[in-house]
């Protein structure tokens, strides 16, 4: 989500530690719900074998601010919310998709804006390593309060049916949080074919699934929010031309279009936003 130093650090994440964490998480989960480890592991393995391989079908192309270092994207009704990053350049904005924002709020340096999610009349905006989360009015974007946030802030989305937020921190774990206090209420290790999937970034909650960008790539995984198992991999590469990609960075914006099976996709410094369907490859 940040610059080259962050890339180097995250690409060096040890897979052995992640595998150990996967085993610990599995045992803890089984102990909590009374199911045997063998049964739980078998179920996860079966789900992993049915991982869908999806691509994108472009339905439309919209303009996007090429100076927006996109960190979060979400639709609420017909309004598109976008959070951007970089110290001294971070902002949050709202407006109709593909048009200039009607409301914008900038973050003062050195704050580095990250993921966003809307909860009715308010929204949350995370910061990367500033250890604060900002609650805002969803209509005016006025700041309402700040709360301490112990982890790195990456992605966030809201599961209203479960009354919780889902957040990422660049690891293979998703953390569940109270939507009012941001207190952690649980966590989930995300796995693909039994292996942890690190560097989970921008998130989008859709029903009981969580869509997550895998940084730094053009890949999206669809995660079962109950088990942590990846149920689909989505290849979103090739949306930009080679010339457009020279200045742009990776995909980092997923917004489900309410009432449809469509999504809006964009990325950091992308000049375009795409209205797409996820389809079998």
Positions of PLM-derived features:
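A short helix->beta-strand "capping" segment at the edge of beta-propeller domains
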Residues: 45-66, 97-100
